[in-house]
Each structure stands twice: as C-alpha cells, then as structure tokens.
Amino acid sequence: MLLSAVGDALGYRNEQWEYCESGEQIHSELEGLGGLGNIHVCLPHWPVSDDTVLHLASAQALNTGKDGDALLHEFAAQYVEAMKDMKGRKPGPTSILGTSQLRPGEPLGFQIPFNPKGVGCGAAMRSMCIGLRYPRPEQLPHLVRVSIDSGRMTHNHPTGYLG
C-alpha cells in the first residue's frame, strides 16, 4: 500500500499530471525536475490523490474485522469521512455523488441508486487492499463480493464497480 501511495503521489504530481494524456510531456517535465532519482516524494509538493485517501479508507474498514452488512456500513462510514480530506485533491463527480448518498448506520445506508454515468475507475483505484483481507483461494467469493459491494457505494454501474 505504501508503494501504491508513492506511485499515486508521483503520477498525481499535485494535480499537474493526473489528467495529462501525453507521456512525452510527463517525461519531459520529469527530466526537467532532474529525473526520477532526484524526486523526493513529500508534502507539500507531492500529496497523494483522492484515490489513495479512499484506498486508505477501504483498508481502515477492512481492518475492523467486521463482516457482512456491518463491514459494508464501515466502508460507507470510512468513505464519507475520507471525503472530508479532499482539499487540494480532485475526486471525480461519481465519487462525490456516491459518497453524498451514503447513510452509514441507517438500514441499507451503504446502498446508493443505480447510476447510468457511474462508469469511472474510482472503485478499482481503492480496492487493491481487499485482497489483503481475503488472500486465500477459498476466500475468493468474499473477495469478489466485498469488492463489488464497496465499489457500488460510489460507482453503481457494472462498468464502474467491475472496473
């Protein structure tokens, strides 16, 4: 997870590279910074993006040891709390909408309505740690279920939560 966060901070570059579609431009700017070996990933110039903040929220939910609906309520609570740490970050509109609809603690408060536009990759960006909780082959059904259910909390469209 640490290396994921470092890679995210590098790729994000304080909002400058997140949406840059030109690899040549990024490589040129990286060279202008003295190359990768001269980069010191630290605040304030190299923050992590919203993806890492939400990935950490996923890990915190999983770390509670809860299962079933209790775990899903924990995911919802962690995502809602994580959205309070978005200053200087660019969460996507699907993540913003989805988390605004979560009601952790309320019956089925971890479910949001289907979103025909919820096709981004945010759900995938924060789900890597789920495999750490369910690493064994016999746990595969749990891994898939928790991955889908946590993804649907913001990206409730098959393209979004299966991304």
Identify what each model region corresponds to.
Residues M1-G163:
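Structured, active/binding-site neighborhoods that engage oxygen-rich ligands
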